[in-house]
Amino acid sequence: MTIQTPNRPTPLVLPATCALAWLAVAGHLAWSAEARRPAPVFARENLVAWCIVPFDAAKRGPDERAEMVARLGLRRVAYDWRDEHVPTFEAEILAYKRHGLEYFAFWSWHPDMAGLIDKHGIRPQIWQTNPSPSGEAEAKVRVAGRQLLPLAEQARKLGCKLGLYNHGGWGGEPENLVAVCRWLRAETASDHVGIVYNLHHGHAHVPRFSELLTLMQPYLFCLNLNGMNDDEKPKILPLGQGQHDVALLKIIAESGYTGPIGIIDHRGDTDAEEALRANLDGLKKVLKELGDTAALETYQ
């Protein structure tokens, strides 16, 4: 019996010019994919300076502060304030613009900011403590959501996000942050509401941090770091000096979270530049331990 061999197709041979064109296209696609890839979560460009205004022992003004942040190679500031800073709200915005800084977030709220946000075309996140009302669990969620609704509406009108901030109490528990956020989104169509999570207000959460980060992640607008020891000893600690720092940053790196990362001063007896620099040095130390060369390269 004769087995018939099927006719084999003639190999396609591209002219040299076509082959080069295909190589160019492939190279462009590879470059485009690389360009679209998000920066490593702990990259310098992803960092936000936080708690550097009332806590700064050097008592800098807007221009000095902007110069200091730029000198450290940071590009984003979350602005916290006290009553004495209200007269310089606009000067702060202008100083950041002059130094190429993003006015990333504004603490709580002040009516003077509405006009300034529109006037200067900035769109900061508004960071507000999640309330801790009394009552039963489900009622607390509704009450907290209703308390936040006026600010949520103000943020919506301004084109800003509202970040629910953990600051202790019932409202600072991750499950309750998520519950209030979900209520506002479901009941008031407030999809611009999310969560700002702070490690320095979350020492009790460390044993369950991986689980809690997974719960919060769909709503997370910013994650603020801190050196972490057991029992808040001390509460504020530079990164790299805490017993849990490597483990916590490893969890964050492996979680898939790619949003902003905050580093803090929050020490009224310390120059804010010294505090931020200590956190940057500590962050690099932890990144070396984690082998995160991609993030480390951004600090060269």
Where are these predicted regions, by residue range?
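Short, acidic/polar
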Residues: F55-A70, T88-E92, H110-L116, A144, ...
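Active-site mouth loops of central-metabolism enzymes
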Residues: V48-G61, P133-V141, L237-P238
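Conserved beta-strand positions in the central sheet of alpha/beta enzyme cores
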Residues: C51, A78, F104-W107, Q125-I126, ...
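Bacterial N-terminal signal peptides
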Residues: P15-H28
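Catalytic domains of carbohydrate-active enzymes, especially glycoside hydrolases
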Residues: P62-H85, E102-F104
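Active-site acidic/histidine proton-transfer and metal-coordination neighborhood
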Residues: L101-I195, L199-A204, E297
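Histidine-acidic metal/acid-base catalytic patches
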Residues: S32-V48, D63-R65, L149-E153, K157-G159, ...
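N-terminal secretory signal peptides that target proteins for export/translocation
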Residues: M1-T10
